[in-house]
Each structure stands twice: as structure tokens, then as C-alpha cells.
Amino acid sequence: MTRSVALATCSQMPSGDDDSRLLDAALQADGIEASWRVWNDPDADWSRFDLVIVRSTWDYTVDRGAFIDWTRRVPRLANPTDVIAWNTDKTYLRDVSDAGIEVVPTAWIEPGRAVELPGGEFVVKPSVGASSNGAGRFDSAAAGQLDAARVHAGMLHDAGRTVMVQPYLADVDTAGETALSYFDGKFSHAVRKGAMLPQSTAYGLASGLSTSLSLPERITPRQPDAAELRLGDQVLDLIRDRFGGELLYARIDVLPTPDGPVVIELELTEPSLFLEHDAAAAGQFAAAVSNRLA
């Protein structure tokens, strides 16, 4: 019997993202019929698929509530609705920190609260946002940057967003982020992601409420070190304890610091998985999907 899956995407990318070609081929090789569907297409019949896999739904930030409502209507969804509802607001980092896992230090400023800014270089961004949309990098020592950061935070507050303020970790400019990818709770591969915010500029000020999907990323394969893998294992243990079982897919982004790596973000909803940077990755993803359909 033919097994069928839908790969959910957004209207700007109806055929999927950069992972789509390799993923389509790997699923087909495993005897799985895959088709791309726009998540908010009113004519899509999600019930006819054995599984719906969230992939490049990168416009969900325009109306997160509608997106969460959609996940609740899909009969068989990966990752599950409760995971997606938790993961699509970066306040989940509070839970990660409360579990004793190292994360980037973050101040949370809800609408209506005064905006207090740190010294040095820092980042201001919304708690709900995809890629670097809405993020700004500022330097308190540069003329006008503190005022620009307050304006940026105010714009996000006016849109009803909770603001995150984090120190800018300079090691990302040289070492980059490490993105750890997992399928069914097993480590698959990692890549290096270059810094995405220009130095001492308010990128997010002009585009804080932009619906553009992403900035160009500089991606290269990377072998993670033991400390990064241990940090990833800690996060997976938290996810298992919180939600039960393994997730079909997960990406954990970590940053270097002088005291060891810290978590910057958990991508459990619609991550780029950079399948082209590891020869076995697409096959491992397809095998994990096949196991779910067995």
C-alpha cells in the first residue's frame, strides 16, 4: 500500500525550501509519496495524508494564532501541536534555562514595560519571529544606537510583541553558530552558520515587522565538539520529559562562549535542516518518517 505524506510550506515557497529536492527523492526511495501543500490553503484536505510534516511554513509569524489553530485541525502532524505552540514563542528559553541548561542571557520586556538596555553590543528582537526578521544589533558606545534600539523595541511593543534583549556574543563573528540536527532523537549532522546581523547596525529597525522570509546565510558543514553534543543531549532530555517520546525532527542552535556553548534557539517547528551539507541526512530523515508510518 502506498504511504503518503504532505510537506507543509508557505505560499511564497509552494515547492518547498532548499531541502525539498533531496527530501523528495529520499522519501520516494523509501516508497513514500510526498507532496507539498501550503499550510493555509483552504482547499487542502489534510485528512487524506498518513502524516503531515511541517517544513517551510516561514510566514506563520504574520498570524501565529491562525497557524496554531491550523495545527490543531490536522489529524496527524509532526511535530505535534503542543510542541509547535511552545516552540513558536521564544519565551520557551525561560523553560530551558529553568531546567539548568545554559542559554544566552535574555531580558524579557513585555508591552507596557520600560525598556532597559545593557552596555556593549546587544540584540533586540521579538519573541515571535522567523530567521532574523525583527532583530536589530546595536552598540551602546556608537552614537545614536541606544535611541535607535529604544525606537526599535517600541515598534515591536506597538505590534504587541514581547521584546527580547540579549548580549551580542562576539564569538559568533569568527566561530559562527553550530546548528545540530536530529531525527527521531538521534544526532544526524551539524553545520556552521555565519553571523546574520550586520555589525553595529540596526538591521531590524527597518525590517522589524517585515514579512520577508530570511537573510542570506553562510552555511558550511561542521563537526560539533563534545560540549556542543552534550548540550544538545540536555535539550533533548528536556523535550522528552516535557512532551514524551521523540520528535520526528529537531534543530538546536548553539553559540560558543569563553565558558562553553550556550543555546540560542530551538528549531522544532519549521527548521531548515541543511540536508545538502551531509550525504546521509536526507536518507536519515526519510527513514525517520518511514518509521512513523510503519
Language model regions located:
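Phosphate-binding site of ATP-dependent enzymes
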Residues: 145-242, 262
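A short, glycine/Asx- and small/polar-enriched loop/turn
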Residues: 45-50, 117-120, 174, 256-262
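A short beta-strand motif that forms the metal-chelation/ATP-contact edge
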Residues: 49-53, 125, 178-182, 260-272
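Short secondary-structure junctions
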Residues: 32, 101-102, 118-119, 241-248
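Conserved N-proximal alpha/beta basic substrate-recognition cap immediately N-terminal to
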Residues: 4, 10-110
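Active-site nucleotide/adenylate-binding loops and adjacent lid/helix of ATP-dependent enzymes
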Residues: 2-9, 71-75, 82-175, 229-230
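Glycine-rich phosphate/pyrophosphate-binding beta-alpha loops
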Residues: 58, 132, 196-199, 267-277
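ATP-dependent carboxylate activation and anion-phosphoryl transfer catalytic cores
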Residues: 224-294
